[in-house]
Regions:
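Hydrophobic residues at beta-strand termini and immediately following loops
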Residues: 6, 53, 106, 129, ...
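Short polar catalytic/cofactor-binding loops
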Residues: 7-13
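Short, acidic/polar
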Residues: 17-27, 145-151
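CN hydrolase (nitrilase-like) catalytic-core segments centered on the catalytic cysteine
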Residues: 57-77, 145-228
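Active-site catalytic loop in hydrolytic enzyme cores
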Residues: 84-156, 170-177, 237-255
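Cys-nucleophile CN-hydrolase/nitrilase-fold catalytic domain and related Cys-dependent amidase chemistry
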Residues: 15, 23-98, 105, 168-184, ...
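Extreme N-terminal starter segment of soluble prokaryotic enzymes
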Residues: 1-5
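Structural motif
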Residues: 33-34, 136, 160
Length: 255
């Protein structure tokens, strides 16, 4: 299966401009099975407009994502500000299948309070879905700093993590190392989609979108575009046979 992470600048609060950019990049980089969009790809962290976007733009954006997935016959995932069933605002990653049907929703568990996410409701569960033989789970940005979340999911035999982010350039070393570590320690693939460019507050973003595997980074970039590659279950199996860390885990020790 070929998976690609879209890496793009985001115009904060400009939904239509961001949607057009996604269309352009999907057109330019056709041929993959699965595409992943950055965290809050339609709005950025323009918090003053989040409520308006959640109520007036997100429903149409979800329909548009569904239509794009069906039209292009791809799996398409990314995160948006929206409301949950209780009416609370959440940072939600959604994925649509090749027929445009909603497959899964994941609400960000670890909220990044310094960026104003405190008024959002944190997620309570990470669902695992299966696509073409690959078991897939999800993370959003700050989640990467919490290895126990990824390990608990990996123990349920996850083959691919999809992680979206708006990770700043000043901490790009941490991003690359954390993405690689989550893939290496859990002997799986991790597809990362991060933002590039600057936001309306002049914050620069790190890029590094791409594919990370059980032996480390496979491909990543700091440029606009789509980055990833072919993933193979046989390669994962081979890596897990060389170093069988799951069978050799020692539990019950009082460290």
């Amino acid at each position: 299966m070929k998976v690609m992470a879209i890496q793009m600048p985001i115009k904060d609060g400009d939904v239509e401009a961001n949607k057009l950019k996604v269309e352009q990049l999907l057109d330019l980089h056709s041929g993959a099975d699965l595409y992943l969009l950055p965290e809050l790809w339609s709005s950025g962290f323009f918090i003053d407009k989040w409520q308006d976007i959640a109520e007036n733009s997100t429903p149409e954006l979800l329909r548009w994502l569904s239509q794009e997935a069906a039209k292009r016959k791809i799996y398409l995932a990314g995160s948006l500000i929206t409301k949950n069933d209780e009416g609370n605002y959440v940072n939600r990653l959604t994925m649509f299948n090749r027929e445009g049907k909603l497959m899964v929703e994941y609400d960000k568990v670890h909220l990044f309070l310094p960026m104003g996410e405190g008024f959002l409701e944190r997620g309570q569960k990470v669902n695992i879905v299966e696509i073409e033989g690959f078991r897939i789970a999800f993370g959003i940005c700050y989640d990467l700093r919490f290895p126990e979340m990824f390990r608990k999911l990996a123990l349920k035999t996850v083959d691919l993590f999809l992680v979206v982010a708006e990770w700043p350039k000043e901490r790009y070393d941490a991003l690359i190392n954390l993405a690689a570590a989550r893939a290496i320690e859990n002997q799986c693939y991790l597809l990362l989609s991060n933002r590039i460019g600057k936001d309306c507050f002049r914050e620069s973003f790190a890029g590094a979108s791409g594919l990370y595997g059980p032996w480390g980074p496979i491909v990543f970039s700091y440029d606009e575009g789509a980055f990833g590659g072919e993933i193979n279950l046989n390669d994962l199996k081979a890596a897990r046979e060389v170093l069988n860390v799951f069978d050799e885990r020692v539990e019950g020790v009082d460290f």
